Structures are given as structure tokens and as C-alpha cells.
Amino acid sequence: MSEIFVNSIQKNKNDFAMQIAEYIKMSQKFAALKDNVFFNQKIAKAQSIGKDEALKSYDEVYFAHKKGYLIALDERGEMIDSLQFAEILSKNSQISFFIGGAYGLSENFKQKMDKIISLTKLTLAHKIAKLMLFEQIFRGLCINAGHPYHK
């Protein structure tokens, strides 16, 4: 069974928590899906100082969570459809997704990724992008399993 980690910098862990928990539950028969939420005093302080400090604090938190095939979400990333997304899931037994904080992700961090994708050309609130990512993970797992969720 594959392992999928969604890593996010998020001040309020309760945003869409019920919906995300439902996607995790529905995905259990296909993969071990984990929601890793990070926010601490160091990140809060860094964000109050400015962009460079904030990006550095995100990098430090995320460093220990780089496992398997690494994918960053970025509005300038590659646009892919659900079938291409499902193919990525099928080819990798361990995947880590990274959603940036208020200032995104550093260029240095993004350079260490195996892939950078965009969910849409629109700029989204991080909590909405995260919910969309969980839905697409579930959809991709269903596509790969021949489940009728994706019609």
C-alpha cells in the first residue's frame, strides 16, 4: 500500500478538517494518507518579520518530511489533469506533497522537488488548495483502482 503525505503550513488546523478527514477515511482502502500540519512560534515570528525569514522557517520545518517522490504545489507549476495526476500516484509508492505558507515556498526548496504542479491558474487560499489536493488524491486513487468515483 502506498503512503501519501500532505504537508502544509497552516495556522488554523480546523479549516475544512471534517472534509479532509472524510477524504482520508475514503482513501484508506487504497493508500495510507496523512495530513501533516505545521505551525509554531518560530514560523509565526518569522512571518511577522518578513518573507525571507518566513520562507527559511518553512524550509526548516519541511526538511525532515521530504520522503519519497516530492511534489510542491505552486501557482506557476505544471498544469496536469486528473488522469495525469493518477498516473503520478500509481508510479510512486511514497509521495510527499508540500503546500507553502503565507509566502509560498522558497525557490531553493522548490528546486529540490521531483515535480511542481499547479491545481489551477487561479490564486487560491492555501486551505482551499489543500482541500482540492485531498479531493484529487482520492480521485486519482479511485481512477487507479477502477472505482466509479471518477466518471
From Swiss-Prot:
Catalytic activity: pseudouridine(1915) in 23S rRNA + S-adenosyl-L-methionine = N(3)-methylpseudouridine(1915) in 23S rRNA + S-adenosyl-L-homocysteine + H(+)
One Pfam match: SPOUT_MTase
UniProt entry tagged with the keyword Isomerase: no
Keyword Cytoplasm on entry: yes
One term under GO cellular component: cytoplasm
Known EC number: 2.1.1.177
Enzyme class at the top of the EC tree: transferase
Residues annotated to bind S-adenosyl-L-methionine: 73, 100, 119-124
Main location class: cytoplasm
TM annotation in the entry: none
Stored CDD domains: RlmH-like (cd18081)
UniProt keyword annotations, A-Z: Cytoplasm, Methyltransferase, rRNA processing, S-adenosyl-L-methionine, Transferase
Compartment annotation: Cytoplasm
Any one GO molecular-function label of the UniProt entry: rRNA (pseudouridine-N3-)-methyltransferase activity
HAMAP family: 23SrRNA_methyltr_H (MF_00658)
Its job: Specifically methylates the pseudouridine at position 1915 (m3Psi1915) in 23S rRNA.
Subunit structure: Homodimer.
Record family assignment: Belongs to the RNA methyltransferase RlmH family.
PANTHER family the record matches: METHYLTRANSFERASE (PTHR33603), RIBOSOMAL RNA LARGE SUBUNIT METHYLTRANSFERASE H (PTHR33603:SF1)
Protein name as catalogued: Ribosomal RNA large subunit methyltransferase H
Record organism: Campylobacter hominis (strain ATCC BAA-381 / DSM 21671 / CCUG 45161 / LMG 19568 / NCTC 13146 / CH001A)
Lineage: Bacteria, Pseudomonadati, Campylobacterota, Epsilonproteobacteria, Campylobacterales
